[in-house]
Swiss-Prot record:
It comes from Dechloromonas aromatica (strain RCB). This is D-alanine--D-alanine ligase. It catalyses: 2 D-alanine + ATP = D-alanyl-D-alanine + ADP + phosphate + H(+). Mg(2+) 2 binds at residues 263, 265. Transmembrane segments: none annotated. Residues 101-296 form the ATP-grasp domain. Its EC number is 6.3.2.4. The keyword Glycoprotein does not apply. The lineage of its organism: Bacteria, Pseudomonadati, Pseudomonadota, Betaproteobacteria, Rhodocyclales.
Length: 301
């Protein structure tokens, strides 16, 4: 019997990212069980949360709403079960791209210019103000679900309507076209940066999960001093939201080398296409060791 006791691996759930979560969770479960840990699958869509009583720890491999937005974290707090990843407030903030931006801007971090959209927005004015291309996003979804790249004038309203199908809170974000990068965080350490080069026009759901021609560069090609500066900044961005345990910070870089923080993922994917396992591997940590380390960092607020 391991020192972790009885471990629930939470995956599946009811969000739009259920399929990704099932993939992540099944791999996490196998990695834990392969190390002799008493780990069990737990799908909140199929089992009542009361059934978690008697578990000693929880590994959260849920993605999206009710999984990384503070909801399941609050339930685990009430049951006094230590869990992986960030606490209630940090999870809720990070899931909300709009409020993440408010926090980061107040702290002086660089972020892409953006606007909140409603059905009554002057879409032509916003296109003019932000310029094209821009990205329209549901503020509280992940995996690029509901996201549209707007390249032509007059297309913003339709993009808003698509995003609003997923979330009434919608943002339009100025496109930063120099490159997309991500920084995995484990404990107090920022992992090596990964540069993402999708074969598609941008890093959408298809490129993230279903294609094998997306390129992931690690080392990312940035000068060492620049990489260390950004890794330090990513830790700061994570901590400003109250992040703990592990996570992932995404950022964009423009053609002049200026970087802009984009969002935080507090329950990163653990699939065979996922980014934190890639960075950990470059850092000398294989998948089972990574999963065990994340579980070691489980805590309560």
């Amino acid at each position: 019997m391991s020192s972790f006791g009885k471990v629930a691996v939470l995956f599946g759930g009811t969000s739009a990212e259920r399929e990704v979560s099932l993939n992540s969770g099944s791999r996490v479960l196998a990695a834990l069980q392969g190390q002799g840990i008493d780990a069990h699958a737990f799908d909140p869509a199929e089992q009542p949360l009361d059934a978690l009583k008697g578990y000693d720890r929880a590994f959260i491999a849920l993605h999206g709403r009710h999984g990384e937005d503070g909801t399941i974290q609050g339930a685990l707090e009430v049951m006094h079960i230590p869990y992986t990843g960030s606490g209630v407030l940090a999870s809720a903030l990070a899931m909300d791209k709009f409020r993440t931006k408010l926090m980061w801007r107040a702290a002086g971090l660089a972020i892409p210019e953006y606007a909140l959209l409603t059905a009554d927005s002057d879409f032509a004015d916003i296109e003019e103000e932000l310029g094209l291309p821009l990205f329209v996003k549901p503020a509280r979804e992940g995996s690029s679900i509901g996201v549209t790249k707007v390249k032509e004038r007059g297309a913003l309203k339709a993009a808003y309507e698509e995003a609003a199908r997923h979330d009434p809170l919608v943002i339009a974000e100025k496109g930063v076209m120099g490159g997309e990068y991500t920084v995995g965080i484990i404990g107090d350490e920022a992992m090596p940066i990964i540069k993402i080069e999708p074969a598609t026009e941008w890093y959408d759901y298809e490129a993230k999960y279903n294609r094998d021609d997306t390129r992931y560069l690690c080392p990312c090609g940035l000068p060492e001093a620049k990489e260390m500066e950004i890794r330090k900044g990513a830790l700061e961005a994570f901590r400003i939201l109250g992040g703990r345990g592990w996570g992932r910070v995404d950022f964009l870089m423009d053609e002049d080398g200026k970087y802009y923080f984009l969002e935080v993922n507090t329950a990163p994917g653990m699939t065979d296409h996922s980014l934190v396992p890639m960075a950990a591997r470059v850092n000398g940590m294989d998948y089972p060791t990574l999963v065990r380390r994340v579980l070691e960092l489980a805590a309560n607020d």
